[in-house]
Curated annotation (Swiss-Prot):
Encoded in the Rac prophage. This is Protein YnaA. It comes from Escherichia coli (strain K12). It comes from the Bacteria.
Length: 342
């Protein structure tokens, strides 16, 4: 009896344990199902959150497309950096792509456009300033054309230097053009005109002085002319313009004139003849020899030259003969070339 009771107690206990196990299993299943339900709910919440996040990102991109594009470029840069760190692209390609991303970022941020606008504005301002400067310079050129011409000469000289430095012209051409520019500059500044006027004034002063000397000392002036004419004869002979015979003949005439002048000078010192009378009597004699030399140097026939100068000598004799007797002292010899001696 006791044994049966014990078995019954064990059976009862086993049944209770089984029921408890079944209840526990059922509870665990329910808990698992509840966890899965909760997980599904959480997934739905997460998905809903991602959808909302994406929708928000799209909204921001619509509101600020430039900012969204810049963010995208930033992410692309991060991805590119990862690929470079992993060795998937080399340094050259990486730097090229980074440069492209930077250019894209500058374009999106407006920096490049702003730079272009600033450069355009700067060029426009420079062009306007240059136009104003040119207009002002044209006005100055009208006011002072001489300064404008000199400035143009300076520009031409600079261009000439550049052409010579680049080998476009040789040294001879450079010197020739430089000399022309210098001559033009001297003409513009009046320097050349001043030199010509100074030379002309000097020549006039020399002529006036020679005329005065001739009036004060006609015999001495005649001697000087004879010396000069002898030099001209020597030069003509040296150049082959005179034959030895013609040279000796003309030189003999000069020597004869010199002798006559010496006699006249001696008698003037004795008689005290006025300088004016002496100059009138002898002023044509040296000029005749000059005409002879010039005629021969130009290629005239010696016969024609002597015939012409012989006629002049005859005319001179007539002028001298017409002087008052008191103008020529008795016994005075007038040095002249007669028609027969010519």
């Amino acid at each position: 009896m006791a044994e049966q009771t014990s078995r019954l107690a064990i059976i009862i206990d086993s049944t209770g344990a089984k029921n408890n196990a079944d209840n526990l299993t059922s509870s665990l299943v329910k808990m698992t199902q509840a966890g899965e339900t909760a997980a599904n709910s959480a997934g739905k919440v997460t998905k809903a959150t991602e959808d909302e996040k994406n929708a928000l990102a799209k909204l921001k991109a619509a509101i600020d497309p430039v900012g969204a594009a810049i963010d995208t470029v930033g992410r692309r840069y991060s991805e590119l950096k990862k690929f470079f760190d992993k060795g998937l692209i080399d340094k050259e390609e990486y730097e090229f792509l980074v440069r492209k991303l930077n250019e894209t970022t500058e374009e999106l941020s407006g920096v490049a456009q702003a730079q272009r606008e600033a450069e355009k504005a700067g060029k426009l301002a420079a062009a306007q300033q240059e136009a104003q400067a040119q207009a002002f310079q044209r006005m100055l050129d009208k006011i002072d054309p001489l300064a404008a011409a000199l400035r143009n000469l300076e520009q031409q000289h600079d261009e000439l230097n550049a052409a010579f430095a680049s080998g476009k012209i040789n040294g001879s051409q450079f010197e020739n053009y430089s000399r022309k520019i210098q001559e033009t500059r001297r003409e513009l500044t009046g320097e050349a005109q001043a030199e010509r006027e100074a030379a002309k004034a000097h020549d006039e002063q020399v002529v006036a002085l020679q005329r005065l000397i001739a009036q004060l000392d006609p015999v001495g002036t005649a001697f000087n002319r004879l010396v000069e004419q002898q030099k001209q004869l020597n030069e003509a002979k040296a150049k082959g313009m005179l034959s030895p015979e013609m040279y000796e003949e003309l030189s003999g005439k000069l020597r004869a004139m010199r002798s006559e002048l010496e006699v006249t000078q001696s008698q003037l010192s004795k008689t005290g003849m006025s300088a004016k009378q002496t100059a009138f009597a002898m002023r044509m004699l040296p000029a005749q020899m000059t005409d002879i030399v010039v005629g021969l140097s130009t290629g005239q026939s010696p016969f024609m030259v002597l015939m012409q100068q012989g006629g002049h000598s005859a005319m001179q004799e007539t002028r001298i003969a017409s002087l008052p007797v008191t103008a020529i002292p008795a016994g005075m010899k007038i040095p002249c070339v007669t028609a027969g001696s010519a």
